[in-house]
Swiss-Prot record:
SUPFAM superfamilies: MTH1598-like (SSF69819). The lineage of its organism: Archaea, Thermoproteota, Thermoprotei, Sulfolobales, Sulfolobaceae. It comes from Saccharolobus solfataricus (strain ATCC 35092 / DSM 1617 / JCM 11322 / P2) (Sulfolobus solfataricus). Belongs to the archease family. One of its GO terms (molecular function) is calcium ion binding. Activates the tRNA-splicing ligase complex by facilitating the enzymatic turnover of catalytic subunit RtcB. Acts by promoting the guanylylation of RtcB, a key intermediate step in tRNA ligation. Can also alter the NTP specificity of RtcB such that ATP, dGTP or ITP is used efficiently. This is Protein archease. The keyword Calcium applies. It comes from the Archaea. Keywords: Calcium, Metal-binding, tRNA processing. GO terms for biological process: tRNA splicing, via endonucleolytic cleavage and ligation. Ca(2+) binds at residues 12, 138-139. Pfam families: Archease. Coiled coil: none annotated.
Length: 139
């Protein structure tokens, strides 16, 4: 199963992520966002940030998840490449760790700055093989 793919969107970037579980799909959504920013294959998982979030539905939880990761990029220049998550769909909570390192011009390619997550075209679909998440980020 592929992790994520990009799709055409006027002036922004559309991302479709996949996962056998909801946690894997959320992780791949985050990986897709950071792939817009840099080559995630060069991001070493040397530091982590613990993340605890709750939402009013799964789409809101995804929105908060991506925004939280972008907050760490904006405030600490943290870029991430590995995620360990647990999502409770009954209480609509996410808890986990995002692993990565601080952006370093000598190691990491500077691609496009992702300004924010959006609700535009945001959907989370359960399929026979797992989950498909579709969303757009503002660049």
């Amino acid at each position: 199963m592929r992790q994520f793919e990009f799709f055409e969107h006027t002036a922004d970037v559309g991302i479709k992520s996949y996962g056998r579980s909801l946690e894997e799909a959320f992780s791949n959504a985050a990986l897709g966002v950071f792939e817009v920013i840099t080559d995630t294959s060069k991001v070493r998982p040397v530091e982590y940030r613990e993340i605890y979030l709750n939402g009013y539905d799964l789409e809101n939880l995804l929105y908060k998840w991506i925004e939280e990761l972008l907050y760490y990029y904006d405030s600490e220049l943290m870029i991430f490449s590995k995620f360990d998550l647990m999502i409770d769909q009954d209480s609509i909570t996410l808890e986990g760790k995002a692993w990565g390192e601080r952006f370093n011009d000598k190691i990491h390619e500077r691609r496009t700055v992702v300004k924010a997550m959006t609700y535009h075209q945001l959907s989370i679909e359960k399929t026979e093989s797992g989950y498909v998440i579709t969303f757009v980020v503002d660049i």
